[in-house]
């Protein structure tokens, strides 16, 4: 079966980044390079929260990461490489009362990897899951994608390996290249 490409539908965003007031109302921060609505910035990255711009749609892992790629050059699912980025994710999930989101994390060659290509460090794996075992546990036998779940197993906002066919929203990330 042929799968149609996922095209992001951009609605009026509700930014968490500072909003400036213009003559006609709030001015939503935009990516400095692509014009994509940006919900948060941290270091050299910009973040776009899919649920704030697509009518709260959810996607399989492939569809979610395709959504990010369709935002434009350099956009991909979030790679949680620092504790600060993990905190940004947890704050977004808490503030918007989300049950879960996808990341770019995917199992490759017997270990998880980020789309960014940066070293994968398991900063926030859950201590439990559906079988009460620490994550990643590959409980369903095909849990090859990394999601962040909001207290699903009474464990707080933690990382879980999940089968990629489940539907979730995603945080998209764009690294800003600063020319000096």
Give short role names for the model-derived ranges.
Residues 82-85, 95, 107-110, 120, ...:
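Acidic glycine-/aspartate-rich tracts in secreted/extracellular proteins
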Residues 61-107:
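Conserved hydrophobic ligand-interaction patch in extracellular adhesion modules
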Residues 160-180:
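Short, structured beta-strand segments at or near domain termini in extracellular proteins/domains
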Residues 14-73, 180:
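Extracellular disulfide-stabilized recognition modules
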Residues 58-61, 65, 74, 86, ...:
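Disulfide-stabilized extracellular ectodomain repeats and their linkers
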Residues 99-143:
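Surface-exposed ligand-recognition segments of extracellular binding domains, strongest
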